[in-house]
Amino acid sequence: MIRLPVLAAALAAASLATTTLARADEGDILVQAGHEGRPASCAILHVRACNLGASSADGTMERTWTVAVADEATRVLRAHGYSVVRRPADYDAHDTVKAAVFIHFDGSEPCASGASVGFPATTSRAFVDAWETSYRAFFPYRFVGENFTENEHRYYGFRKVDAPEKMLIEFGEMTCPAQFAWMKPRLTELGDKLAAFLMERVPK
């Protein structure tokens, strides 16, 4: 007889394998939750740099927040008739969409960072500016800039999708107690704002 915990673990592993080994897809928008599925997905896809993401002072993991925001944005977009390709951190596919967003929260020396964006040269200035204008008006803390690290500018996810608009979004620094306290009750709202931005910028 298979014990229930063992069966549950086996089903979870099978589900993860199905997600990470997904086929290439096409749609209107790709939404990736940063670090989702790690560390398990790193072993399946032989990822060497298995970055597990940031964590707050109370142990909250970045990958729980990215999933919450990504799932809410995906829910809203699909409810409005958009075709959404929803991806975790690691997956064996190359997708084609009109716009791709990659969701993250920063980790740093406490309160040394804030919100930021990363994007390749092919992303339009109008797309970046529209997000920055919207989010700066909402986020009451520091906006640290664009492509301010190589990991942002050359994010691996950009290579896994064909899209005219690609952008990594750092919503804020979860290692800063003030920013963490502000963002924690607003994860659903962050997903809603991201969906609203994408619906304004991406035609169905």
Give each language-model segment a name.
Residues 69-73, 131, 194:
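Hydrophobic residues within alpha-helices
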Residues 123-151:
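Active-site-adjacent substrate-binding region
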Residues 25-92, 97-100, 106-107, 113:
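Active-site histidine-acidic residue metal-binding/catalytic motifs
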Residues 14-21:
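C-terminal segment of classical bacterial N-terminal signal peptides
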Residues 29-30, 100-112, 116-118, 149-204:
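Active-site-adjacent mobile loop/cap segments within catalytic or ligand-binding domains
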Residues 60-68, 121-126, 180-192:
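Soluble non-cytosolic domains of exported or imported proteins
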Residues 82-85, 148-152:
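Short gly/ser/thr-rich secondary-structure transition/capping motifs
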Residues 1-9:
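Bacterial N-terminal signal peptides that target proteins for export
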